[in-house]
From Swiss-Prot:
Pfam families the record matches: IspA
InterPro entries referenced in this protein's UniProt entry, alphabetically: YciB
UniProt keyword list: Cell inner membrane, Cell membrane, Membrane, Transmembrane, Transmembrane helix
Family to which the UniProt record says this protein belongs: Belongs to the YciB family.
Transmembrane segments: 7-27, 32-52, 56-76, 93-113, 126-146, 153-173
Cited HAMAP family: YciB
Protein's organism: Bradyrhizobium sp. (strain BTAi1 / ATCC BAA-1182)
Gene Ontology CC entries for this record: plasma membrane
Protein name: Inner membrane-spanning protein YciB
Main localisation: membrane
Amino acid sequence: MDKTQPHPLFKLATELGPLIVFFVVNAKFNLFAATGAFMVAIVAAMIASYVVTKHVPLMAIVTGIVVLVFGTLTLVLHDETFIKLKPTIIYGLFAAVLGGGLLFNRSFIAIMFDQMFNLTPAGWRILTFRWALFFAAMAVLNEIIWRTQSTDFWVGFKAFGVVPLTMIFAIAQMPLIKRYHQDPASLEASDAAEGDVSKG
């Protein structure tokens, strides 16, 4: 099935919308009501993404599954620990998958973003390693915040701190992307030249 590229504002809405719902409902009611609303918003965002683009990103699917599992545990057991652990689990999982892939000479960042960037193999490895470190650091940061700060502070950080930090980190990778960028035309020419040599 063909995928269509969503409008940047739509993509931003599906990513930030559930977090804003989580923050607003927590401020008006409590964390348990916010957890239920967050679960509904996550599912709604995935459905909207599929309806508009005919595709749901893998990271969104993984995040949605973890949210539903830990959100359900939070509501059933009436224990806010589970929903607070959710970001740690997600970030830790992403870090482990990216880092583990590098051990087997696989760059999962390249698999996800090869249509957006044309990098050399070395560039993809470095970028993957950096994102693995970033997710590991975010897992540690989440643990520190929810264990040492108030619930309201943690919710505020989750809603308005995580996205800016991620965007800043992503922007900081642009010099690396430019340094290891390879022009598709020159890459095709190189492949053609190698083919001619092998035929000769």
